[in-house]
Amino acid sequence: MLNRTVLVGRLTKDPELRSTPNGVNVGTFTLAVNRTFTNAQGEREADFINVVVFKKQAENVKNYLSKGSLAGVDGRLQTRNYENKDGQRVFVTEVVADSVQFLEPKNNNQQQNNNYQQQRQTQTGNNPFDNNADSIEDLPF
């Protein structure tokens, strides 16, 4: 039997980190994963999948991932249940991650925006390759 889950998607919000009474770090986050097909309106839908990660990897997720970060998760699907305050049985299905891969540098969205602004400034500044008719007489040929 095989229970293996591999996902690539973006975090819907910043990861949460807490500790068990025994001091084990537990990280949780939700990954938005696009479906491979489009709906009747031609739009691509996404699934929102809860992920749990433990120990040092939970700390790393908290420190290096944030809302919108692209991440890869390798783990297993697990269903747990508990009784809520109204006495009803609640079932929760989530991915327990064995490995979380950071698929882009931290603050990549901000960095891309800065690169775009720098590119625009360069385009509007002095361009040494601009065809300027004033300097054509200085050419040696």
Swiss-Prot record:
Coiled-coil segments on the chain, per record: none
Spell out the protein name for this chain. Answer: Single-stranded DNA-binding protein 2
Q: Which cysteines are joined by disulfide bonds?
A: none
> GO CC: one term?
nucleoid
The organism of origin for this protein: Staphylococcus aureus (strain Mu50 / ATCC 700699)
What segments bear the compositional bias annotation Low complexity? 107-127
Give one GO term, molecular function aspect.
single-stranded DNA binding
Q: Which UniProt keywords apply?
A: DNA-binding
